[in-house]
Amino acid sequence: LIRGQEGAKAGENYHDLDIWGGGLNANLSWFLGKTAVGFDISKERIYSTALGTSLAENDYKDISGSDRKYDHKGERTNTNIMLEHNFIFGGFTLSAGVLANKNTGLDHDFRFYPGVDISYRPNDNWKIYASWNKALRMPTYTDLYISNVVQQGDITLNPEKNSTFKIGTRYRQTGFSAVLSGFYAHGTDMIDWVQTSETEQKDSKYHVMNIGKLNNMGYNLDATIYMQELI
């Protein structure tokens, strides 16, 4: 914001974001386990003074409580179709599924994101588990469209893609539980705001970019005492 100025001159932006959608889910238990299917669809629409593509003047939208108008608009539709199956045999549980996703902000193609979870319970106290899944994160409207004195968005951004592996064990008895787990996440096309020697030749702004690969590793140790169970 610019001190001493008001409205557009002060750098104020107005945004009106609507998200609506719905979904259906169903599951079936049979002799090979439990199968679930699902479908959901959601639509995002933003009117803004800064984010989105420029509107024709006759399509401007009034801003409540202001003499300014929304002169930018963005919208995209996200569709998910899910299939998952759970199989239990003795102390083993295996869950495998796939998500088919289409986002019109990217293109009109479906992309598939699988996932697998497996766990083993040798007794009532212990659980050992592992999982792997793939996921995608779309750029935000800010990532795509923002343009001011310090930031520059990019409408050609690719979505972030992640593959995550987890492994862990859980112990539970009356009054106490403990979890030890570790993870490894491999990301590509990760989105970040950066300054480089190339961008500094153009301006002093931070530019949003797909910076490439990013690997994260970590572990977690958590212990909980349930006093109400010990009393």
Pin down the residues of each PLM region:
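Face-selective signature of the C-terminal outer-membrane beta-barrel domain
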Residues: 1-111, 119-121, 179-180
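Flexible, surface-exposed loop regions and adjacent strand-edge segments
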Residues: 2-12, 52-61, 113-115, 145-152, ...
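Outer-membrane beta-barrel signature, preferentially recognizing the C-terminal barrel domain
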Residues: 107, 121, 127, 134-188, ...
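Structural detector of well-ordered beta-strand residues that form the stable sheet scaffold
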Residues: 95, 129-131
